[in-house]
Amino acid sequence: MTVATGDPADEAAALPGHPQDTYDPEADHECCERVVINISGLRFETQLKTLAQFPETLLGDPKKRMRYFDPLRNEYFFDRNRPSFDAILYYYQSGGRLRRPVNVPLDIFSEEIRFYELGEEAMEMFREDEGYIKEEERPLPENEFQRQVWLLFEYPESSGPARIIAIVSVMVILISIVSFCLETLPIFRDENEDMHGSGVTFHTYSNSTIGYQQSTSFTDPFFIVETLCIIWFSFEFLVRFFACPSKAGFFTNIMNIIDIVAIIPYFITLGTELAEKPEDAQQGQQAMSLAILRVIRLVRVFRIFKLSRHSKGLQILGQTLKASMRELGLLIFFLFIGVILFSSAVYFAEADERESQFPSIPDAFWWAVVSMTTVGYGDMVPTTIGGKIVGSLCAIAGVLTIALPVPVIVSNFNYFYHRETEGEEQAQYLQVTSCPKIPSSPDLKKSRSASTISKSDYMEIQEGVNNSNEDFREENLKTANCTLANTNYVNITKMLTDV
């Protein structure tokens, strides 16, 4: 008995789920075709359908990867980092999971992601896995005049006049802080003590004389300096407010809140002193107004935080503290537990001592805090053996408690510091290597008219301009590769089908 062998196409048509009019054996064979990728001498093999999962990437787009095809060896050659390609190929094989190899630095792997054009989504996923904190976008005003004024006062590195304004602002802040400190010197208070004719009075509380300039003398040098500083602070604040892109977001910025805190005490103090009536002294209200004015004037010391607007170091420190709030909270919580435990222990250990310096547990809180932070003032010391043992354990526990979150805080500081320095270096490099016709680029014009900008966006704009020249060279390289393939006639069929 003889059984005739049918055509494979007929057998495929007879199978359920494979209609004859939709099944294409050549297309299935093409998708399962192997591709050889040579990374600096290390060969990788995969299938075309694996790369085709991400057609927008360098390896997934046949036209893009054709520039790197070597017809002599019938493979794609990339002179790139070899250890990184394990993770790049796994990205295609796993359907989008990106994991950095342990032996590959962060900056090198980031460059490989950009080279293989895995996209912004893959880059953001990689940064999140590595613990990167996304840089927030900084909005810009849509009006051209407001944008120029905003850049002038908010971005000192944007132009020469902006740097001059920043220098003037820093000088005014320093003068204000120095004046705030100098006016408390005894020599100036002694001089003011003789100025009864100009409205300066001294008040006595609990047998102690407190010198305070109750009524501000408008000829006093410190008042004149303070007034000039407030005029500059107010002018700067109002200009920023009218030029800001978002009035609601303006008051949520911590730096603007510091500006308000630096200005308000002057006007409250001035208004209180001008509104004070002479008969208030007989009503006993001067003591209350003096205490209120002292608290308000104390707020002036917060002007020193205005320097953080012009200091990268203070900004990095603030970002570090903000990112380390969880660790700082744990540190305070551990210290709180330790203070309760050791203050209770030292109180009961010293309870039988007549000359004990720990009359109660709350009184021992101060000793526990000083001991756990290894300060050790010595104003309160245990005298019994049990108390000394508790003190030793308190100091050791304090050292261990404080040392635990320190590495995390230091790591956050290093991250923000390196991100800032690398961003400045990359921005300087892009400015040097960028083409001179950048202002005429349509992409750049479009970006400049946008409502938001960030440091990463600025770098992408510059990279896009630089890539325009690279695309021209790549097209020439592609033409050269095709010419070489036609000349050598090596596997020309595979090369054309791959395209």
UniProtKB/Swiss-Prot annotation:
Location of the region described as S4-S5 linker in the Swiss-Prot/TrEMBL record: 312-325
Topology with respect to the bilayer: Multi-pass membrane protein
Region called Disordered, residue ranges: 1-26
GO CC terms: axon; axon initial segment; axon terminus; calyx of Held; dendrite; endoplasmic reticulum membrane; glutamatergic synapse; juxtaparanode region of axon
Effect of residue 263 to T: In DEE32; dominant-negative mutation; loss of channel function
Glycosylation sites: 207
Phosphotyrosine modifications at: 429, 458
S-palmitoyl cysteine lipid sites: 244
Extracellular side: 183-221, 276-289, 348-361, 382-388
InterPro entries, alphabetized: BTB/POZ_dom, Ion_trans_dom, K_chnl_volt-dep_Kv, K_chnl_volt-dep_Kv1, K_chnl_volt-dep_Kv1.2, SKP1/BTB/POZ_sf, T1-type_BTB, VG_K_chnl
Transmembrane domains' residue ranges: 161-182, 222-243, 255-275, 290-310, 326-347, 389-417
Site description Important for binding with the scorpion mesomartoxin, residues in chain: 381
Domain-level remarks: The cytoplasmic N-terminus is important for tetramerization. Interactions between the different subunits modulate the gating characteristics. Besides, the cytoplasmic N-terminal domain mediates interaction with RHOA and thus is required for RHOA-mediated endocytosis.
Disease: Developmental and epileptic encephalopathy 32: A form of epileptic encephalopathy, a heterogeneous group of severe early-onset epilepsies characterized by refractory seizures, neurodevelopmental impairment, and poor prognosis. Development is normal prior to seizure onset, after which cognitive and motor delays become apparent. DEE32 inheritance is autosomal dominant. Nizon-Isidor syndrome: An autosomal dominant neurodevelopmental disorder characterized by intellectual disability, global developmental delay, speech impairment, and behavioral abnormalities including autism spectrum disorder and aggressive behavior. Other features include a thin corpus callosum, and mild facial dysmorphism. Disease onset is in infancy or early childhood.
Further remarks about this protein from its record: The delay or D-type current observed in hippocampus pyramidal neurons is probably mediated by potassium channels containing KCNA2 plus KCNA1 or other family members. It is activated at about -50 mV, i.e. below the action potential threshold, and is characterized by slow inactivation, extremely slow recovery from inactivation, sensitivity to dendrotoxin (DTX) and to 4-aminopyridine (4-AP).
Complex formation: Homotetramer and heterotetramer with other channel-forming alpha subunits, such as KCNA1, KCNA4, KCNA5, KCNA6 and KCNA7. Channel activity is regulated by interaction with the beta subunits, including KCNAB1 and KCNAB2. Identified in a complex with KCNA1 and KCNAB2. Identified in a complex with KCNA5 and KCNAB1. Identified in a complex with KCNA4 and FYN. Interacts with the beta subunit KCNAB1. Interacts with PTK2B. Interacts (via C-terminus) with CTTN.
Protein family according to the UniProt entry: Belongs to the potassium channel family. A (Shaker) (TC 1.A.1.2) subfamily. Kv1.2/KCNA2 sub-subfamily.
Protein name as catalogued: Potassium voltage-gated channel subfamily A member 2
